[in-house]
Swiss-Prot record:
Assigned protein family: Belongs to the SLX4 family.
Organism: Scheffersomyces stipitis (strain ATCC 58785 / CBS 6054 / NBRC 10063 / NRRL Y-11545)
Protein name in UniProt: Structure-specific endonuclease subunit SLX4
Complex and partners: Forms a heterodimer with SLX1.
Disulfide bonds: none
Amino acid sequence: MVDSESQNDFANDGDNDSYFVSTQFESKQEEIMEKELQKLQTGQTVSQLLRFRSGISGLTSVTPKPVKVSRPGLRKTGSRKSKKNQSMSAMVKERFKTDKYAYFSGDQRKIDEFLRRLEGSEDIENMAMSTSGKDGSCLFTRDEWICIVQSIKLRFPELSTTKKKSLSAITRQINKQEKENEDENSIWSQARSLPSLELTDEDLKWLYDLDDEQMANRTITSSMTEVDGNDDHSPFVMTLSQTTPSQLSHIKESDSLYSQETNVQTTEPADHQSGHMQRCHSQTAEGKTQSKILEIEIVSDSEEEIESLIRNTEPDSSEDVYGANEVSSHQVPAVDALASFQSFPFAADMIPRNNVRDKEHESLHISSSIRSSPAQSLTQSQVPSSIDSIIEPPCESPRKMSPIRDTQPEPVITSPFKTPTKKSKELLSKYSSPVKNSIHNNMGSPVAMMVPRSSESAKHVEEIIVSSDEESVYSTAKSVFPSAQIVISEVEDEDEEFYEIVSSIPEKHKPTAAAKKRKLLQTSRYEVVSNFNINDYDDDQRGFKLRKLETKPIIIDSDNEIADSEEDEKNLSIIEITREVEAEESEHDTEYLINLGKQVEGNSKMNTSVLQVPSSPSSITFGRTDILKELEAFSNSDLDTDRTINSNTSKNSNAIKSGTNQTIDFTLLSTKELQERFKKWELKPVQGRQRMVSVLSEVSKLFTNSFNDPVPETRQGFEGTVYGSLNRLVGSNQYWHEKIISFEPLRVSELRDWICTKGYELEEDFLMRYCDDNGYCCTRQP
């Protein structure tokens, strides 16, 4: 039993193995057959495509090249090299010189096969069959293909997107042009257009044809010298113009053209009294002939050239000459060939005087010049009339000399109030002064002033101070008034003279010798942006004078500047205040300014610095409120109550004094509060509590004055209060004021030293900030 079972198991295992092997054979056979079929199909496809292979560069291998897997490399951070731009000629050559027909040049059968596969190529195929030979290998030559491709490129060029236009855009542009042509009805469009169809043949003949008489006269030259005086016909110029039908209807067939003949003949140069009589003929519409006598008198000159004459004619309004009212010409009248510069009316005023003096005793007989009325036509002729006139040179007027006196001449200064600038005066001597030369030549002088002269004092050198209209009329402490005179004192030597300027102050106001040593005059000037009503006021007790110099309007350039609404209809009032300063009060200040001026004058060459002038420089201008505040220094209970506040306005340079200030006690504040105060006012921070207290205390003196201004809490309020006090302080001093208005750089160290004398110890950084914010030139250079 056991053996039978084992045999059955073995038989079953053998059947299973044979079935497995058979299935493996079948799968392998199917794979082989599939590969063979695929290879066969590939071979058939390749054989079909091989017909399109080019003879020059054929396919070397059917198997595709293995594709390499490339990993993206790191991008370079460096700058890429810019490619060189190719010229247009190189691009054109590269495009049109490349051989694009290499594929078709190998085998003609490729072209035939390609054309057969194209849809809609029946006509071309039939044409190819008809034109081909027996072998059918020739369809088109190389040159024919090139012509076909070039024609396609010419008909359908590759335009850029900017140059391409759609059909709607082209239609819109054409309609716009047609509409403009319809609306264009100007005279130029009528003139450039051809004559309308309404013109008849006779009209065209009248316009363009010439008759026999006109054709015969075409040989006559236009030169007046070649015309024979006995010729009945004169040369003329004919122009053709296109006329509109409306203008043509006004012209009658009976109208005719008229010509004028003028022959000019000159007499001998020596004959000054004989004239040539010439007859001018004119033919009117009725055929009548009128003649007028034209008398021209020729006057010879000393030179060989013919002197041209000034011709004047008077219009004859009694009759219409040459039919001027019938036909009007558009031609410009011809210029006489003999006309020269002397023939024009304005030539007499431009002739030099020496030429007139040379011909003083000559009598010039000049005929009247041709005049034409503005209301008459340009071609209307005038009948001349002979008018002899004699031009005599104008006699020189006698010189106006002042009565002779034995005293020495005292030139009077006619200059008004002048500022002490570099070019405020101009000294003119007797030998080089153009004013005196013009007086001698009687040519007129711009200076309305006559200096007394005498025969005895003619040898002395005189110096005259001439004022200019461009000079300023504002007065300062150094101003010279009109009543001042120059006293000329002679010494034994005639070449040396000493001048002494006499003061213009009245005798009652002149200080004595002792007073001159003890008192000093100080002048200040305010510019108030308003029409400030003020009366001149003199206070002898307190020693100050107040006057209003001028009120000038504020001129705004409307083209380059936008006017502020607050500045409309306002004027600029200029007020001058002069006061006497006691020597005891200003002795220290005066000595300091004198020494400072000497130092600056001595080091003017070494300390010269070149700085940029600020873009918005302006003189120190104070408002109405600033001047009203200054009244407190000059207020007096003895003044009349009916006087206005404006009449008491004056300048007090010492209004800000440290003695009257009520400073804030910053020592009671903590360090944190002091730092906050620095931040609010944007001051430069310093180290140390004592240093912070010192800086704030000195700065606070400028706004804690007698006016009890509130302590500012913001930067704008701080700058407005402190800068206003500094402006009044600096503007009260003539030295610093002149430096500011002349844009001279301010040395911050010197300005700080001067302010320290007034009781304010400010930092240089703060003064630099003050100058920069106000547009003042400043420098730290010592």
